[in-house]
Curated annotation (Swiss-Prot):
The organism's place on the tree of life at top rank: Bacteria
Family, as annotated: Belongs to the RbfA family.
Cross-referenced PANTHER family: RIBOSOME-BINDING FACTOR A, CHLOROPLASTIC-RELATED
PROSITE patterns: RBFA
Protein name as catalogued: Ribosome-binding factor A
Species the sequence originates in: Geotalea daltonii (strain DSM 22248 / JCM 15807 / FRC-32) (Geobacter daltonii)
């Protein structure tokens, strides 16, 4: 059985993803993907995790753009959700995608034929 906070988190994820495609016009916001949303059990805080393709400067600019749009997003949440209290929003960059791709590249390097040849020579 789902907790209410999980249902709200799913709804926030859908709404913010839709707003990124249709509603936000900030030029600082690049190609953003919402990777997850966590809502506290008391429904007072929603932490939205995102990734963005680009340099570190573009990531920082995107985070600033998202944070400047928090009021607009909360207003849209208030229109869409029937809740007594609309949660505050915090955006956090999700580095797990970069970490996963780095691990994947290391594993590919370990499994490459070139690496296997070096192991045979050392044996």
């Amino acid at each position: 059985m789902f907790k209410r906070s999980e249902k709200v988190a799913e709804a926030v994820h859908e709404l913010v993803s839709e707003l990124l495609v249709k509603g936000l016009k900030d030029p600082r916001i690049g190609f953003v993907t919402i990777t997850g949303v966590k809502v506290t059990d008391d429904m007072h805080l929603a932490t939205i995790y995102f990734t963005v393709i680009g340099s570190d400067e573009e990531k920082k600019a995107t985070e600033q753009g998202l944070n400047s749009a928090r009021g607009f997003i909360r207003k849209e949440m208030g229109k869409s959700f029937r809740m007594r209290y609309v949660p505050d929003i915090v955006f956090k960059y999700d580095a797990s995608v970069e970490y996963g791709s780095r691990i994947e590249s290391i594993l590919k390097e370990i499994g490459s034929p070139e690496h296997d040849d070096n192991d045979k020579e050392n044996s």
